[in-house]
Curated annotation (Swiss-Prot):
Organism: Paenarthrobacter aurescens (strain TC1)
CDD domains named in the record: CysRS_core (cd00672)
Protein name: Cysteine--tRNA ligase
Record HAMAP family: Cys_tRNA_synth
Domain of life from the UniProt record: Bacteria
Catalysis performed (reactions): tRNA(Cys) + L-cysteine + ATP = L-cysteinyl-tRNA(Cys) + AMP + diphosphate
Cofactor: how bound: Binds 1 zinc ion per subunit.
Classification of source organism: Bacteria, Bacillati, Actinomycetota, Actinomycetes, Micrococcales
Length: 484
């Protein structure tokens, strides 16, 4: 089956044919590092991590770029709040955080969140502040082509002229006259209120460290310009996929596409957007107190459970969070892990005789090829787990082995094997744990053989108190670790 993805620009699912044979180029918007990561950030990262993994599984060499917006009005505002009345004081007298330090601190928080949930590092992760010359070049190209102009009030701002580009609004299928004015700068100096800032002139009271010299005066780049300059530097003027959250379609992605194409770049062949996360059907909002952060989720469940939950819905659909969501995800992960452990103890986990592609069920491949239909793919995964358990119960070790290898292949491509999982038996520490538990089970088996039921029950109870669940079967006892 041909890979097919939904393209926001054409509003249809269409065949994905890489621009370069055997390769795929993907850019998705990273964070504006002004605060702690929220659940929407990590859901988006997991969605595009699933996309990357699937493209790689299908034999493509994937180049991924995820930017870091480390200079922005919101970052400066957050830093200014920390300065309070001491903004103009000598640095030694301030109990504050400079904007660049604040941005870097939150950037590390995002990196930690991504890593804890098994999101692969991108090929390139450029910071906006490291690409100012490329932004200047792009602005000049737009001015030269008649699509941008310095502000009429000598403020040092440079704006994109939306009416100069006839395709403006095409990504989100809007008419210019129906749009509201751009909120990113004072409307003075604009030809049209909808024109958006490419360059923001330095203003009195702003930190001098947050300005760069330019042909139009000292200042800093506009948010939309940053992404266009960075993506074309690393992926070129035309690339396969541009992604991000649904909330970025307008104005951010609309403006990105307009300024890039107006500058002469073909830009993205596909636009892919992931859905939002809601709380019991309502939009998450700090003001009404119905938000949940990745850190809070990780206090309630293991990283693998959180990744399973955030990645279980179709990437384009809304993911609704409820107080029981993580419990339900934990039960699903436990079913998978329980089978993997039981089957591994019977047939081993050595390298399979065939490739991961051969182990992957055809129905799973068809689901993932069809616009990353992860819910359908997970259905195949759980059906394989059920079939594997049935094979184990009937003593069909070859059937159990085939199911095990299929399950391992599916969890790998979904990224569920790469998440830190302290409950899994892996590594030297867990190997030692396994030896100790198996020794206890051998002692219990000996007690049962001698009909010493009290000793047998005592060993079982001791293991249970340590979080080890023992199950007796026709072929002996198996064990697994209890999940919270």
């Amino acid at each position: 089956m041909t890979l097919r993805f939904y393209d926001t620009a054409s509003a249809e699912v269409r065949d994905f044919v890489p621009l370069e044979d055997g390769k795929a180029s993907v850019y998705y918007c990273g964070a504006t590092v002004q605060g702690m990561p929220h659940v929407g950030h990590v859901r988006s990262a997991i969605a595009f991590d699933q996309l990357t993994r699937w493209l790689e599984f299908r034999g493509l060499r994937v180049t991924v770029v995820r930017n870091v917006t480390d200079i922005d009005d919101k970052i400066l505002a957050k830093s200014a709040q920390s300065f309070g009345p001491d903004w103009d004081a000598e640095p030694s007298a301030r109990q504050t955080e400079e904007w660049w330090a604040l941005a870097y601190r939150y950037e590390q928080e995002f990196e930690n969140a991504y890593e804890s949930l098994g999101v692969q590092r991108p090929t390139y992760e450029p910071r906006a502040t490291g690409h100012i010359p490329e932004m200047h070049t792009l602005i000049q190209r737009l001015i030269d082509r008649g699509h941008a102009y310095p502000a009429l009030d000598d403020s040092g701002d440079v704006y994109f002229d939306v009416r100069s580009w006839s395709k403006y609004g095409s990504l989100t299928r809007q008419n210019i006259d129906d749009m509201q004015g751009a909120p990113d700068a004072d409307p003075r100096g604009k030809r049209d209120p909808r024109d958006f800032a490419l360059w923001k002139g330095f203003k009195d009271g702003e930190p001098v460290t947050a300005k760069w010299e330019s042909p139009w005066g000292a200042g800093r780049p506009g948010w939309h310009l940053e992404c266009s300059a960075m993506v074309t530097k690393y992926l070129g003027p035309r690339f396969d996929i541009h992604g991000g959250g649904l909330d970025l379609r307008f104005p951010h992605h609309e403006n990105e596409m307009a300024q890039s194409q107006a500058a002469g770049d073909e830009f993205a062949n596909f636009w892919m957007h992931n859905g939002m996360v809601t709380y019991e059907g309502e939009k998450m909002s700090k003001s009404i107190g119905n938000t949940v952060s990745p850190a809070e989720m990780l206090e309630l469940a293991s990283p693998r459970v959180v990744r399973y939950y955030l990645g279980q819905a179709h990437y384009r659909s809304i993911l609704d969070y409820r107080p029981t969501s993580l419990q339900e995800a934990a039960a699903a992960v436990e079913r998978i892990d329980g089978f993997i452990h039981k089957a591994s103890s019977k047939v081993g986990t050595g390298a399979p005789d065939v490739s991961p592609q051969a182990n992957m069920p055809a129905a799973f491949i068809a689901a993932m090829d069809d616009d990353l239909n992860v819910p359908q793919a997970l259905g195949v995964l759980h059906e394989t787990v059920r079939a594997g358990n049935t094979a184990l119960a009937s003593g069909d070790l070859e059937g159990a082995k085939a199911a095990l290898y299929s399950v391992l292949s599916m969890t790998e491509v979904l990224g569920l094997d790469s998440v830190k999982r302290p409950e899994a038996v892996q590594g030297r520490e867990h190997a030692a744990l396994e030896v100790l538990i198996e020794a206890q089970l051998e002692a219990r088996a000996a007690a049962r053989a001698n009909k010493d039921w009290a000793a047998s029950d005592a060993i079982r109870d001791t293991l249970a108190a340590a979080g080890v669940v023992v199950e007796d079967g026709a072929d002996g006892a198996t064990w697994s670790l209890k999940r919270d």
